[in-house]
Amino acid sequence: MAATTLKDSFPLLTLLGIAFLASVCLSSRSDQDNPFVFESNRFQTLFENENGHIRLLQKFDQHSKLLENLQNYRLLEYKSKPHTIFLPQQTDADFILVVLSGKAILTVLLPNDRNSFSLERGDTIKLPAGTIGYLVNRDDEEDLRVLDLVIPVNRPGEPQSFLLSGNQNQPSILSGFSKNILEASFNTDYKEIEKVLLEEHGKEKYHRRGLKDRRQRGQEENVIVKISRKQIEELNKNAKSSSKKSTSSESEPFNLRSREPIYSNKFGKFFEITPKRNPQLQDLNIFVNYVEINEGSLLLPHYNSRAIVIVTVNEGKGDFELVGQRNENQQGLREEYDEEKEQGEEEIRKQVQNYKAKLSPGDVLVIPAGYPVAIKASSNLNLVGFGINAENNQRYFLAGEEDNVISQIHKPVKELAFPGSAQEVDTLLENQKQSHFANAQPRERERGSQEIKDHLYSILGSF
């Protein structure tokens, strides 16, 4: 078979060029029908009382079939008031816990020991499935806000929690055992066990209520309760702070913001911890990142080669644009390409889809692998992301002075792939002097705004 020439490769190169130049897309979708955006009201309240709440985001694959690869991942949001404690429990799921705001004491129980950690904003730790722990808001004024990525080990997407201490609405895990087993296990009469460890008749009352009634009664459940300052001081005595070392331990928390950012300039900062840099993340194959985009700035268009990134808006507002395929049915795409093969570029371009969304605190975004994305901040924007399939992931930027993959294309290929000449493409790419983050306003618009301001100043100066 004869070797393929550059001219023979023209349709493929054209496709690559169109994928790079996301601005050519002919259609867009707003927040309402955007399969990659979950507004904050998509969180379901599992528990709420005067001391705080626990909320779980709806299943990713229930929101869209495009997210079926995330069926075993859930997002959990926890919030509590000052001087409160989230009582001991264990869950059949691995957790990656990130402190969004506030100060906490996390105690993790081991068979023959316990570890307590003093946590602050940006601190992150993995809690293996089955770990029993309790979380205290040790601050005097600020609410504690925690985000958890949850990976169940029994039923995909269905984490189950078991309380160590019970109440009338949710009994202790111990109450599920028979009297004989409990008496033999503790070598104590059942009445004493019931008095000391179990909620009296809690199991019977619990099963008499339906799910709806239990949710209504959730206001009375003692899952998040008050704790005294003296008790907090006792718990905080031997608490360790997060690791500031370049390499983290297998069990201690690490702070996302204490390391050097991988990208940084006056427009924003991008912090990231990968499995290579942290052993806690290796078996889960997940990276965690923390992004700060300053008001009026832009995280430049880029995509991840392998990772699917789940992003939560912690603070601020902005705009999100994601480029994908208009028709996600690949069989349908092939049929259209066969029918319109001679039209080439024009027919392919119609498949490029722009997904847009306005971002507010609590919103969640999903960025599939290979889908270019850009995020603009209308106010100081803070994002927390979990990257699934982190191993061997590569981030490719499509604009900017550094790490711009388009600039690596050979000049003869640029001549074939883009409407402009190779020189024109290079000149265009060189217009952007920033890397990774940049001013969100185009240069011409910025210049025009400055001219208007100067004109207004000259008019006002005449008075």
UniProtKB/Swiss-Prot annotation:
It is found in: Vacuole, Aleurone grain; Vacuole. GO terms for molecular function: nutrient reservoir activity. Residues 235-257 are annotated as: Disordered. Keywords: Seed storage protein, Signal, Storage protein, Vacuole. Residues 238-252 have a biased composition (Low complexity). It holds the Pfam family Cupin_1. Residues 1-27 form the signal peptide. GO terms for cellular component: aleurone grain; vacuole. SMART domains: Cupin_1. Seed storage protein. This is Vicilin.
